From Swiss-Prot:
It catalyses: (2S,6S)-2,6-diaminopimelate = meso-2,6-diaminopimelate. Pathway: Amino-acid biosynthesis; L-lysine biosynthesis via DAP pathway; DL-2,6-diaminopimelate from LL-2,6-diaminopimelate: step 1/1. The gene is dapF. The record marks 164, 213 as: Could be important to modulate the pK values of the two catalytic cysteine residues. The active site is at residues 74, 222. It is an enzyme of class 5 (isomerase). This is Diaminopimelate epimerase. GO terms for biological process: lysine biosynthetic process via diaminopimelate. Keywords: Amino-acid biosynthesis, Cytoplasm, Isomerase, Lysine biosynthesis. PANTHER family: DIAMINOPIMELATE EPIMERASE, DIAMINOPIMELATE EPIMERASE, CHLOROPLASTIC. It comes from Shewanella loihica (strain ATCC BAA-1088 / PV-4). InterPro entries: DAP_epimerase_AS, DAP_epimerase_DapF. Catalyzes the stereoinversion of LL-2,6-diaminopimelate (L,L-DAP) to meso-diaminopimelate (meso-DAP), a precursor of L-lysine and an essential component of the bacterial peptidoglycan. It comes from the Bacteria.
Length: 279
């Protein structure tokens, strides 16, 4: 039997598994079955806690989408990861250092129960996002063949450990997230696919955001997407250093001191239930 915990960060939900004290392996087919909301446990991502590869770190953090693919980053998942390892007694520190497939992260458990995550320095160089463009720009033109014909979108592109494309919209509630997101997420200029954010700027300290996630469709919240949107908005001169991001599942606070500096995200992480499955 494998023990797991169901958690969520603003409705972005996870199956979290301790791979430190348990010997676990999940095939892509198993993950797809477990992610099914009718016949499985149901989740956006599976989070796996593994022993560190570096003695200076506490854990290795792996993320698998509902379609079974492994991805580089998940900000909401990182907050749940921190709460999980502390509550399960895997660590007794407030500050936790982890590695992911895209780098290293610092997670900090706050007194009010929220978690602050150092999401790293936003990557703007196109080849490292990866995004096919000659040079880094604040705004790119992205052409897509829509059912009604060729359409051009203005977007920002950034990596937060995973690739993001951010579009500004006038009214996020009425944005065609499913249709546009499902096309742009596989756009040829993003060789590894892309998460697509739809951002409405309320004022310099407040945005509303919906995200179509690569491999998972639209979710109630996307932490790395919130960070990407704030980075793009700030680079375009529309946002301040501290921004409240309202997502369908709730709000996050993002702090960024500007280019070349790490971006910090603070938000909740909630325990739902503990369970076990047969391997």
């Amino acid at each position: 039997m494998i023990h797991f915990t169901k958690m969520h960060g603003l409705g972005n939900d996870f199956m979290v598994v301790d791979g430190v004290t348990q010997n676990v392996y999940f095939s892509p087919e198993q993950i797809k079955r477990l992610a099914d909301r009718n016949f499985g446990i149901g989740f956006d991502q599976l989070l796996l806690v593994e022993p560190p590869y570096d003695p200076d770190l506490d854990f290795h953090y792996r993320i698998f989408n509902a379609d079974g693919s492994e991805v580089e980053q998940c900000g909401n998942g990182a907050r749940c990861f921190a709460r999980f390892v502390k509550s399960k007694g895997l660590i007794n520190k407030q500050k936790i250092k982890v590695s992911t497939s895209s780098g290293k992260m610092t997670l900090r458990l706050e007194r009010d129960g929220s978690v602050t995550v150092n999401m790293g320095i936003p990557v703007l160089e196109p080849s490292r996002i990866p995004f096919n463009a000659k040079k880094a720009e604040k705004t790119y033109l992205l052409q897509a063949d829509m059912p009604e014909g060729m359409q051009t979108f203005l977007c920002g592109a950034v990596s937060m450990g995973n690739p993001h494309c951010v579009l500004e919209v006038d009214d996020v509630a009425n944005a065609d997230v499913e249709r546009i997101g499902s096309l742009l997420t596989k756009h040829e200029r993003f060789p590894k696919g892309v998460n697509v954010g739809f951002m409405q700027v309320v004022d310099a300290n407040h945005i509303k955001l919906r995200v179509y996630e690569r491999g998972a469709a639209e979710t109630l919240a996307c932490g790395s997407g919130a960070c990407a949107a704030v980075a793009v908005g700030q680079l375009q001169g529309k946002l301040a250093r501290r921004v409240r991001v309202d997502l369908p599942g709730g709000s996050l606070t993002i702090n960024w001191e500007g280019e070349g500096k790490p971006l910090w995200m603070t938000g909740p992480a909630e325990h739902v239930y503990d369970g076990q499955i047969q391997q």
